[in-house]
């Protein structure tokens, strides 16, 4: 079980942040807010603070400096995190708060994979990377309130062939990321890629988790 370092008053101790990290955090928090609103899950509403924390937690660890969240270098780690999450649920001892925090972590990695500077095809400088992250912060905050973003989640929700196991999820991530690498990249397009991927992945993971533990309440529309 993952643990954070806390003080006597329950304060979360986090490493000092760079301006780049602050910009990344705001983009991830905007995405998390969108997913919370669209999923319409009472359980997530109860544990949304944990989901928000998970969505920024990977950027708040020293490991981020030496192991940036790039598909080529961290995808295997993400797969392990997802498999560990399912095992945690299957153990029957999983806590809802921890499950939603870990789901937030998964969303963080997926969002980074579909952010241009986090891929080997990006050949810009560190300054270019920071400027892209700055623009992404503003673009994501705006995009999640558009009709296009709302339509994406609804389309994913109604889509046939919902993901039912981790093999299907991994296949989808890998295929979609390969397509993404061959596409034109800009901030607006990245926002759409991220929203599409995270919407489909979150719906799929909730499907898998609810089937792994029948005590968990499925979403009202999940098996409609």
Q: Can you describe what each PLM-predicted range is?
A:
Residues 2-105, 110-224:
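N-terminal leader/auxiliary helical segments
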């Amino acid at each position: 079980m993952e643990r954070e370092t806390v003080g006597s008053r329950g304060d979360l101790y986090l490493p000092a942040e760079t301006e780049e990290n602050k910009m990344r955090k705001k983009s991830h928090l905007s995405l998390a807010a969108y997913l919370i609103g669209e999923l319409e899950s009472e359980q997530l509403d109860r544990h949304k603070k944990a989901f928000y924390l998970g969505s920024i937690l990977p950027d708040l660890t020293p490991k981020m400096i030496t192991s940036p969240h790039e598909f080529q270098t961290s995808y295997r780690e993400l797969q392990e995190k997802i498999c560990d999450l399912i095992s945690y649920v299957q153990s029957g001892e999983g806590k809802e708060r921890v499950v939603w925090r870990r789901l937030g972590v998964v969303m963080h990695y997926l969002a980074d994979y579909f952010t241009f500077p986090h891929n080997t095809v990006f050949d810009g400088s560190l300054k270019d990377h920071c400027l892209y992250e700055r623009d992404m912060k503003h673009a994501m905050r705006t995009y999640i309130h558009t009709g296009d973003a709302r339509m994406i989640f609804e389309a994913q929700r109604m889509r046939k062939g919902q993901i039912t196991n981790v093999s299907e999820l991994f296949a989808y991530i890998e295929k979609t990321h390969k397509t993404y690498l061959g596409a034109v990249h800009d901030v607006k397009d990245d926002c759409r890629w991220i929203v599409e991927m995270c919407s489909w992945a979150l719906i799929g993971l909730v499907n898998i988790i609810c089937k792994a533990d029948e005590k968990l309440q499925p979403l009202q529309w999940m098996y409609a």
